[in-house]
Amino acid sequence: MSNFDIRTLAISKTGEVPVRNASGEKQYDADGKPLSITVHSPGTKAFNAAQHARQLRNSDRMVNKMQGKADGKQTAEDATEERAEFLTAITISFNNFGIDGQTGRAMFASVYGDLELGHIADDVEKFVGDRANFIRPSTSN
């Protein structure tokens, strides 16, 4: 029997996504604090539930499409809204920034649903799609 505990390879429960402009440059507030977004990792129940809800919507749409129902089609607006819903569900906080005085889920949905801020949603989706972004820091030297 090995002494290696495989759980030491588990990913963190959260990750911090740096906010970048459309050119890929990290952004900071007026005091020099970095803008970031804290998200649930793919190794959490919250992420799993959000992903499952997204997959159910897609499955329902496919069934409706196969049955010739009108609600089997996804518009561009639907796609944007559904992506915003998923990202909102996996977001814990926006750090050092906001929009229009909003807070919580309304703020998250507002940013993720704004096509002019689409690069932020793109970055968050890309970040959570790579489990390596959630690797725990090593405790050994």
Language model segments and positions:
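Short, solvent-exposed coil/turn linker segments
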Residues: M1-A10, T75, S93, G104
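Noncatalytic linker/hinge segments flanking ATPase motor cores
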Residues: D5, D78-E82, D130-I135
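Charged, low-complexity surface segments at secondary-structure and domain boundaries
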Residues: L35-S36, M66-Q74, M107-Y112
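Residues that form generic nucleotide/phosphate-binding pockets
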Residues: A50-R57, I90, D114, F127
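C-terminal charged interaction modules
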Residues: F94-N141
